[in-house]
A protein has these predicted regions:
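Conserved C-terminal portion of the radical SAM core fold
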Residues: 147-207, 227-249
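Auxiliary Fe-S-binding modules of radical SAM enzymes
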Residues: 1-2, 201-295
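Core AdoMet radical
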Residues: 30-50, 54-78, 93-106, 122-149, ...
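Distinct, well-ordered alpha-helical segments
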Residues: 78-86, 107-116, 177-179
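Structural recognition of alpha->loop->beta junctions
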Residues: 24, 89-94, 181-196, 269-286
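Acidic (Asp/Glu)-rich catalytic clusters
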Residues: 54-58, 85-92, 112-122, 154-158
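Canonical Radical SAM [4Fe-4S] cluster-binding loop centered on the CxxxCxxC motif
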Residues: 1-45
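Hydrophobic faces of well-ordered beta-strands that scaffold small-molecule active sites
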Residues: 2-6, 64-66, 97-99, 123-127, ...
Length: 295
């Protein structure tokens, strides 16, 4: 079922002073906001534009999942949040809702709303976790630690909701060994689905300045390209529990926004084919390095 990325216009506590100012060092909202979300319009209008957008590219469907991607989509008062969620779920072609948010922006009151909606709709929460290492989270000005993510995931799963996590591969200070070792902590979260994507350095971000000042702290510097990333992703998959569905391995953003992207313009579907081919060559599968089979 096709997901429709939408923008509810909500901000982030790491930008407005709720947690901090300036946002995460790597973040540029424009990089993952589809063109049909720009220029305003109600959520219902965005949905219609999104459906037309995908139909024009041959992606037809009877029903869709609304995906609140941009911003922190639990960061408002409960009345506003209920209005947003119900507007999306009332669309005749929407069969479910995925809410992207931060692990420090969930409460019992919000979980009550989501649990109630889940009785008649598919509801999932996707947390931007980004790293399992507190030193990294602090360095990128994330505004929360990994324990916060552990707690948020556990509370959300206790309500019977599907929970996903988003992680960035290649944040400063993390080696290949750190990334693979961190999969043990990810597995302990017992996520229903997961997204990985490579660090892309966006123009005008704080991390762009950091990259130019000390690129040796980034694994994507010094010749780490598509072959090396393919091998790393295959190793991640082999250490990842097969009970967690992988939704993404690579991101793609408009080129004019990117200052540095070591993987060039390879598309996610092309990269997925490359990874599957490499795993086949290795006679490998998800979780085989940890001896876990899918339930």
């Amino acid at each position: 079922m096709q997901k429709l990325a939408l923008d509810a216009g909500l901000t982030c506590p790491n930008r407005d002073g709720g947690v901090g100012y300036g946002g995460c060092t790597f973040c540029l909202n424009e990089a993952f906001s589809p063109s049909y979300c720009r220029g305003g319009g109600s959520l219902s209008e965005q949905l219609d534009k999104a459906i037309d957008f995908h139909l024009s590219r041959g992606r037809s469907g009877e029903h869709y999942i609304a995906y609140l991607q941009a911003g922190t989509n639990t960061y408002s008062d409960t009345d506003t949040l209920q209005k947003i969620y119900k507007e999306l779920l009332s669309h005749p072609k929407v069969s479910g809702l995925i809410i992207g948010t931060r692990p420090d922006c969930i409460s019992s009151e919000i979980l009550d709303i989501l649990e109630d909606l889940s009785h008649s709709n598919y509801i999932a929460v996707e947390y931007g976790i980004e790293s399992v290492y507190d030193t990294t989270l602090q360095r990128v000005n994330r505004g929360h630690d990994f324990q916060c993510a552990i707690d948020a995931v556990a509370k959300t799963k206790s309500r019977g909701l599907d929970v996903g996590g988003h992680f960035i591969i290649g944040l400063p200070g993390e080696s290949r060994e750190d990334i693979i070792s961190g999969i043990t902590k990810i597995n302990a979260l017992n996520l229903d689905f997961i997204k990985f994507h490579q660090l892309q350095i966006y123009r005008g971000t704080t991390i762009e300045k950091e990259y130019h000042a000390c690129s040796d702290d980034f694994i994507f510097a010094n010749g780490f390209g598509i072959e090396e990333y393919t091998d790393l992703v295959c190793d991640i998959i082999r250490h990842l529990s097969p009970n967690t569905a992988i939704e993404r391995l690579l991101s793609l953003a408009p080129r004019h926004l990117i200052s540095h992207s070591p993987l060039g313009g390879i598309r996610p579907d092309e990269f997925r084919t490359r990874v599957v081919s490499r795993l086949t060559e290795l006679n490998a599968r998800q979780g085989d390095k940890i001896g876990v089979s899918a339930k």
